[in-house]
């Protein structure tokens, strides 16, 4: 259908990111690390070792750069399709067309952008300087932007511990709800493996007349538990 044509650029980018990107291994103190979207986003970018952060960032960036023309072409196709749809539906601009789907007017959108650029930007700059100070960095580079303010806030967590945390989080919703949620561990509804070609983030698949499946790439951090919940 026509929708598949208009949304194909996003599909191309998603498949390219999940299946085609190859990032070079990197070495720190004699140890070789494999890099991927999942491991970089979930682990290396906030690693406590500055050399791991820096080398993984270079590996990550070089991997992206190899596909920059394809990504740019897909993005241009997306922009053109949105422009065409906006014109066909009689909107004044692509902004108005996209915001209408979320029932947000242009004035509110512009206000948010202004707040981010004028009011939030100075706060973000002070925060990053504080992160650098807390972590003993003389200079903060782009590779350090995702560094945790306190590594204790994102500790290592086992899958069994994650299940326990999930069950505790749903206890206030009642016994019946908890029993239903418990099925996802007993019946193995979650695909944890961070396999090559698997997209980053967390997703739910809802096959017809079958319980949902959760797809995620587990890296053993507390942030993964939030995704699971």
Positions of predicted regions on the chain:
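His/Asp/Glu-rich acidic catalytic environments and adjacent acidic regulatory segments
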Residues: 1-107, 111, 115, 164-187, ...
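Intrinsic disorder/low-complexity segments enriched in polar/charged and small flexible residues
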Residues: 147, 186-187, 191, 205, ...
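Hydrophobic alpha-helical segments with strong N-terminal bias
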Residues: 74, 203-204, 214-218
């Amino acid at each position: 259908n026509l929708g598949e044509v208009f949304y194909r650029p996003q599909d191309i980018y998603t498949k390219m990111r999940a299946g085609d990107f190859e990032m070079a291994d990197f070495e720190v103190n004699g140890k070789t690390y494999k890099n991927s979207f999942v491991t970089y986003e979930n682990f290396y970018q906030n690693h406590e070792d500055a050399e791991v952060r820096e080398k993984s960032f270079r590996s990550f960036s070089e991997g992206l750069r190899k596909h920059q023309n394809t990504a740019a072409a897909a993005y241009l196709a997306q922009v053109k399709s949105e422009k065409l749809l906006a014109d066909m539906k009689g909107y004044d601009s692509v902004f108005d067309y996209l915001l209408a789907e979320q029932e947000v007017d242009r004035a509110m959108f512009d206000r948010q952008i202004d707040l981010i650029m004028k009011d939030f930007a100075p706060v973000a700059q002070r925060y990053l300087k504080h992160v650098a100070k807390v972590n003993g960095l003389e200079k903060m580079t782009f590779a350090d932007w995702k560094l945790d303010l306190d590594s204790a806030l994102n500790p290592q967590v086992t899958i069994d511990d994650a299940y326990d945390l999930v069950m505790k989080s749903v206890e206030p919703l009642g016994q019946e709800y908890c029993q239903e949620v418990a099925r996802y561990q007993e019946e193995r509804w979650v695909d944890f493996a961070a396999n090559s070609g698997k997209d980053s983030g967390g997703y739910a698949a809802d096959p017809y007349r079958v319980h949902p499946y959760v797809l995620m790439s587990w890296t053993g951090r507390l942030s993964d538990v939030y995704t699971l919940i």
